[in-house]
Amino acid sequence: MRRKTNIFWIIFSCSTLCFLSLIGVFLRIHQSKPTLASYSSAPVVIIDAGHGGMDGGAIGVDGQIEKEINLSIALKLDTMLRAYGFQTIMTRDSDVSIHSPDAKTVRQQKTSDLRNRLKLLEDTSSGILISIHQNKYSQSSAHGTQVFYGKNCPESKELAEMLQKTITGYLQPENTREIKQATKDIYILYQATKPAVMVECGFLSNAAEADKLTDEEYQDQIAFSICTALMNCLADQS
């Protein structure tokens, strides 16, 4: 009987120590995690789900449609940022183009759509834009996230660097792509006077990556990486 009692107390003690250790780990992680209250001034995050409506964007090797993937990731990111207390604005939260009513032709509608997205950023006090897109290339071997940034604001490059580092570190350790400054072909980033970045999450021309980009769990991981990168970048700047 005494032996059974000793064994019980040994098991109980070990279990208690393990439990306390887990609590300690949790508290260290929780305390080190950036919170909105730690930032000197929190931006209004404009989440831009690229394309929409009549503009489907890139089409994947198995028929995946870019605009749908963009919106799915953007909605997930919106939910995460709001959970952390951020104020967010989505350029679209459904399958629509946001062109002005007087735009009649497809060309006019696409141009108007881009201008309205840019205007939303420029009209938002303390606005910062994160645009979600997917890539496509003639060579199916091309893969990996790549982040582009606007040229008119130093914070854009800082955020792009943190995004690239976080996404590749968490999801794509083999990805050696580097961030790029946007050219005039990326209208919103090129014209923006406020912080603006575009996350090309992956290549729809790569069959394996296209499959991942349509996977809900992988989309959650992409959105989480973007959310984490933004918070870490703001913490560094504060």
Task: Set out the residue ranges of the language-model regions.
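Catalytic-site microenvironment of enzymes
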Residues: 1-238
